[in-house]
Amino acid sequence: MEQAFSRTELLLGSSALERLAASRVAVFGIGGVGGYVCEALARTGVGHLDLIDSDTVAVSNINRQIIATTKTVGQYKTDAMEARILDINPAAKITKHNCFFLPETAADFPFNQYDYVVDAVDTMSAKLALVTHCHAADVPIICAMGAGNKLDPTGFQVADLAKTKMDPLARVMRRELKKRGIHHLKVVYSEEPPIPTADAGQADPDHPGHRNTPGSVAFVPSVMGLILAGEVIKDLIKAEK
């Protein structure tokens, strides 16, 4: 696979590629954001990826999720993502968890073996538990804030959670993490105000029992995912130096 990453080596150097090949990154949530995180990490040569998601690919995912096609509908998202990654880099090691991350299942995940964690889940309890466990294990984590109901992909920023503005999810995260003694967290967020959708209050087809289906377009969650992956890559390379 040396030729596959030769252009990357020109930019990052051989030692950086070796570091990435030896790295293990866990991506929690393989959806519109997390799928693009995995895609970029795989194409940059990260050697071991943990894929965590309980969902299967739905028709309503096709508008924004890189793993979603008419051929993958019904497959576990982790299976579809694994197949795609191995088509990109057959040497990659994949660990799959076909489950939903919850505070009570946190013990099933080897946080002390991860070099980096990406939070791309969409429930507050899971996000808080992820950050808390990474903090306890001294593992770097980057979190995705709200990407739904937005149209401006140029509005995303990388910041400390304490410095975010205009993001309702970030506001709640900041308050809840402060209660847990955690005051700093790297996040990707947007200051674009959420756009009201016509079907507000209707059930979410991707998450039975949930209300307020968020609107989405292909060019917003994908950009957030690529930014998240870029931060992971840059941080892993810095840690190697």
Task: List PLM regions with ranges.
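Glycine-rich phosphate-binding loop and adjoining beta1-alpha1-beta2 segment
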Residues: V46, L51-N89
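Glycine-rich phosphate/adenylate-binding loop
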Residues: E2, A21, F109-Y114, A126-A129, ...
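Hydrophobic/small residue at the entry helix of a nucleotide-binding pocket
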Residues: V33-G34
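N-terminal charged helix/coil linker that caps or initiates catalytic domains
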Residues: M1-A26
